[in-house]
Amino acid sequence: MLWKSVLSVALIVLGIHDCSFKFLEIDKNEEEFAISVEHVVFHFNENQDDDFAYKFLRVRRSLRQKYTLKYLVDLEMGRTLCGKYDEDIDNCPLQEGPGERKVRCTYIVETEAWVTKFTILNSTCVQT
């Protein structure tokens, strides 16, 4: 009988552990997610050797880890004609022709938007 109790507790713990790390689809317009996207684009530009700024094009996936404010941000960005320190990059035209570049990035970001704190836990970008 004791082994059944131990097995039941183990299954409950494993079930809770498994559920707590799943990412679930969310509305890409959710406020904390949208702020996280802005931070990701800023972070990408700050850490690029390229003198040109990249701007947000579209969200491919918007996910949040269950019971947390950790977001998986999967987005596309395009290289603009503006420098990365210019104002109003959102309205800057994209480069065309030989200078045209687009990237797809996936970031995992922990967000505490109420204190303007963002922690990038993981990131991967590939040129498309």
From Swiss-Prot:
Q: What does this protein do?
A: May play a specialized role in spermatogenesis.
What tissues express this gene product? Located at the very proximal caput epididymis (at protein level). Expressed in epididymis, Sertoli cells and testis. Also found to be weakly expressed in ovary and prostate.
Sorted alphabetically, which InterPro entries does this protein's record hold? Cystatin_dom, Cystatin_sf, Cystatin_spermatogenesis
Checking SUPFAM superfamilies in the record gives: Cystatin/monellin (SSF54403)
Q: Where in the cell is it found?
A: Secreted
Output the Gene Ontology terms for molecular function. cysteine-type endopeptidase inhibitor activity
Which CDD domains has this protein been placed in? CY
List the protein's name.
Cystatin-12
